[in-house]
């Protein structure tokens, strides 16, 4: 018999908020039962799969990774970084907040917008740059206009090539990913590799909370409830109120990536599981 390994990033019920296609869910369930091993991307997903009846004894978690040589702040030219900030009208002495991701409800970007008036009252010299595409594009524009903050929000509803995305990370001061469902969330790893402090959703099935240490000497970011704009605002101000501390968090983030989140580490952990089945 040839062993079968089923790799699972997300599930139909998770992506669709408990709704979705029964046919797809049934196929996922059937494959889980047939497989000798299930590999998923976080311990949060491992527990969620078990909660929905998948056999826990079969499920292993192997984190995703990032290329820290490619995502390296020190390889970005200062003039290229300055061009990004200039493009979005962010002066050198202002703070640039960055969100990158699909513009869909699970990513929490609407909740981030609702957090911004509170942030801007305390830190008016701040701009939020939103990079992504999705069904919430019109809602994002309407929400920022309704909240009276459209002059402090920059949208770019476009696919941005990787090299340019890296420059956006380099140009930012803090990266915010307030997801309410995120099996892993590679954007926070990319930001961490670029030495940026991160504010991440950490309630529910969210892999961010395994990447980001939110207290102690190795802290590299802040955990928030992605469904609560008040909590998101609190998380952002925790970073903005102390630039020196934020720099230290960014350095800690890259150290954590180098230790736990390289693709070599992913390959080694995955190979161990495969070898155990042979």
Q: What feature does the model see in each segment?
A:
Residues 2-5, 13-34, 76:
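Nucleotide-sugar donor phosphate/pyrophosphate-binding loop at the beta->alpha transition
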Residues 44, 65:
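Carbohydrate-associated surface elements
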Residues 91-107, 113-116:
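Conserved donor-binding/catalytic core segment of Leloir-type glycosyltransferases
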Residues 140-159:
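Nucleotide-activated donor-binding/catalytic signature segment of Leloir-type glycosyltransferases, i.e.
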Residues 159, 167-172:
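Short alpha-helical donor nucleotide-sugar binding micro-motif in glycosyltransferases
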Residues 180:
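Aromatic "clamp/platform" in nucleotide-sugar-dependent glycosyltransferases that forms part
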Residues 197-207:
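Short hydrophobic beta-strand element within catalytic cores of glycosyltransferases
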């Amino acid at each position: 018999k040839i062993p079968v390994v089923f790799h699972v990033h997300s599930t139909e019920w998770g992506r669709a908020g408990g709704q979705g296609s029964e046919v797809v869910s049934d196929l996922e369930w059937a494959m889980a039962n047939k497989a000798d091993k299930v590999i998923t991307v976080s311990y949060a997903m491992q527990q969620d799969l078990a909660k929905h009846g998948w056999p826990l004894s079969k499920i292993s978690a192997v984190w995703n990774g990032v290329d820290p040589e490619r995502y390296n702040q020190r390889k970005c030219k200062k003039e290229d970084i300055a061009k990004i900030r200039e493009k979005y009208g962010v002066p050198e002495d202002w703070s640039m907040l960055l969100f990158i991701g699909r513009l869909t409800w699970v990513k929490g970007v609407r909740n981030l917008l609702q957090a911004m008036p509170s942030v801007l009252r305390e830190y008016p010299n701040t701009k939020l740059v939103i990079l992504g595409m999705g069904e919430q594009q019109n809602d994002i524009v309407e929400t920022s206009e309704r909240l009276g903050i459209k002059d402090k929000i920059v949208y770019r509803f476009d696919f941005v090539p990787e090299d340019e995305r890296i420059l956006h990370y380099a140009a930012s001061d803090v990266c915010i990913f307030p997801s309410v469902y995120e099996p892993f969330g590679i954007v926070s790893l990319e930001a961490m590799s670029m030495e940026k402090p991160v504010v991440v959703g950490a309630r529910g099935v969210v892999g961010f909370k395994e990447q980001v240490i939110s207290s102690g000497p190795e802290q590299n970011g802040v955990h928030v409830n992605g469904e609560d704009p008040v909590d998101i605002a609190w998380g952002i101000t925790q970073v903005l109120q102390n630039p020196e501390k934020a720099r230290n968090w960014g350095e800690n983030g890259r150290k954590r990536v180098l230790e736990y989140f390289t693709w070599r580490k992913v390959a080694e952990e995955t190979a161990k599981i495969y070898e155990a089945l042979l």
